[in-house]
Amino acid sequence: MEVQFENLFAQLSDLQPTSELDCERLKATLVNSCYQYLHCKPSGNYFIPRDHMDALKRLRRNEDIIISKPDKGNGIVLLDKVDYVRKMEQLLSDKTRFLKDNKEKDLTQQVEKAITKLLSSLKQRGIIDNNTYERLRPTGTIVPRLYGLPKTHKPGIPLRPVLDMVNSPYHALAKWLCSRLEPVKKLLSQHCVRDVFEFINTIEGMNLNDCKMFSLDVSSLFTNVPLKETIEFLGEFIEQNSIDVGIPVDDLKSLLFKCTENVQFKFNGGLYRQTDGVAMGSPLGPLLAEVFMAKLENNQLSNAISKCKVYKRYVDDIFVILNKVHDPKTMLETFNKAHANIKYTIEFESLDHLAFLDVSLTRRPDGSIRRTVFRKETWNDQYVHFRSFVPMKQKMNLINCLAERARKICSEDTLADELAFLHQIFLKNGYPKHLIEKGMQPRPASDKMLTVEKKCVYVNLPFKGDALAVFTERRLSSAISQAFFAAKLRVYFTTTPAVRLQHKDKVPSSEASFCVYKFSCSCGTGYIGRTTRRLTQRVREHHPAWIKSGVTKTINSAVVAHLVETNHRVNVQEAFQPIYKVNGRLPKTIKSRILETAEAIAIKLFKPVLCSQKQHIRALQLAWPTSQRSIDNRQITPIAFV
């Protein structure tokens, strides 16, 4: 908790305080608010009954099931583990897409070195600056993990394979490449819509007289994208159109191949490689899929598309309005001949009705289109229950967002029915009638006044009830606005899910990176340190192999010095433990800053003996009192947002 408040104050460092006195008052308020919030117990009004919690614990301990979320929609899905593994291995048995890595060796560190080498070359040639290099250079990453999401809306409940690329060596670079290629994507995507609302604007006022309406679906698009063909086409398009993406085309292609080709991943303890196609979960997946589809649409399919009155695509879902003189089945045959990798399926109107994305479209007798919100058959009337332990703001935002969504999707003759339906659904989910009516009111358009823009500073706190949340937010906002006129506070409250999903391979604590760790000797002497690399690498420096042989070599660690001087022996796995881990989804520069702060706070609070001579400890801005409590008994919450 202290890390959050220390980091909050650090975000104000580039602003001018109103006075030194107000700044010191703010510091005192932050320390006081931190410990007041830390010691407050969560409100008991929303607690899950004990028998319910016991049942959830039994589910978590049951090794014969997989706890997952559905591929689409809300809810929890319980899967038989044997059946889940069988379905996933059946997907992985496709030799044209996946390959079992028989070496059974995690090559993450080798991938880190290869990407670092490519980035170093770009930096040396002045293509990227040092800040970009440090931000993209992979450190302390883990092998991507594959999991499957059950498609509960389809017969047999097939699984959609998803690759968790967060904190992998490819992730930061892939996101950066996506940002560089966004202008190229916009130029290519003539037929693409960003969301359902852009789609509605496209068909607004359309008439279906003498026309046929149908949809096409691309089967398994991501895994069927031919990487080499797509990346080569992308490079040619950039060169032919003289698009400046800030990086030479040859280097761009090298980086794209490094992030997508032969990616090693883990499933059920085994290591595999994806030999072609892009993975669901990779930041580059949607971009390369979009580039490939645009290639087909602008070349092989351009003549067929030109015959359509409307042709709009969202990723792999396509909506078509075609004049009756043309045959949709002939068009389907043309599409299926466009590329050997890609197959399309077609869905026609049924009783003048067709669903596309979140919209249900109905042909009226006069040819106009009636619109309402579409929900799949598996939808279960479930939203966040009013008794759920989440902030009231989130509940009110849910009502307002769904009402606004209905106003944008529905036509005039269906809007009232949709709003009435939402009203009943929220009543079923425990919401009071007056809050539903309040939340469904249209938000008035706010007149933006021309004022000096303020810097937003952020703090993330575990949610402990609405009363405490409102009080803390008001107190912090008042103190910050008084000390720094140019600052604006944003407080984010997080909740811990009652049921944690269990569909990914667990990451061993020894592979933790960007973490603060503790060393506990058998004599009670302690040490606290930080590492951006994998913990196992840092531990080898604290406890080198030669320490057991009796041969003394160069000592550059307080832990090594202590063990050599005292001749104490420790169990490495028990002696070194991570006590704080920074959220892997944060940018690297922010993670590094938070990590330094977390280490400094831990040393300040617990004063481990072996850290007395430690150098390069981040200077703390707030006056944290020294704690006499054991670090073993202290709850340390990882940062989720900055």
Tell where the protein language model's regions lie, with residue ranges.
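Charged structural interfaces that engage phosphate-rich ligands
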Residues: M1-V642
